[in-house]
From Swiss-Prot:
This is CASP-like protein 4D1. It is a multi-pass membrane protein. The keyword Hydrolase does not apply. Homodimer and heterodimers. Coiled coil: none annotated. The chain crosses the membrane at residues 12-32, 58-78, 98-118, 145-165. It comes from the Eukaryota.
Amino acid sequence: MAPPPPSLASRMAALILRILTFIFLIASLVILTTNTATLELDLVEVKVHFKDVYAYRYMLATIVIGLAYTVLQIAFTLYYVATGNRMMSGDGNLAFDFFGDKVISYILVTGAAAGFASTKDIKPVFSGSGDFDAFINKGYASASLLLIGFVCTAVLSVFSSYALPKQV
């Protein structure tokens, strides 16, 4: 049996990377939005949610933007794999892939960086207070999954960089 044509292999690789990005972003979203802790400070218990940390709100926004773009690109890629034709005629789809992948990858990495930085900053302040260590660990886990989603999108960005000069 002959190997598939390179164009089909690259289309399938792009589809797999987009699906992996989607999975990592969904996992990051679930971990982040379910992140709560109870702080015990001088006989007072305070319930802390992820939305109380500004950087986690930014992480949430980057995850939602990344998910919206990834779902759109999965639909475009599925159509391309199934039919061999792009949704948009001309070079519009390639340019959209090129610029979209670049912008989204930068958005995702800034969200991950904000998550890591804020988690590192608040860790020494509240360490050992109630179940705050679990809150910290979930923050790191969510930021890590977001970073892995960025890596998948960055690889897709390289693929779209190679595809654009071939068509333009």
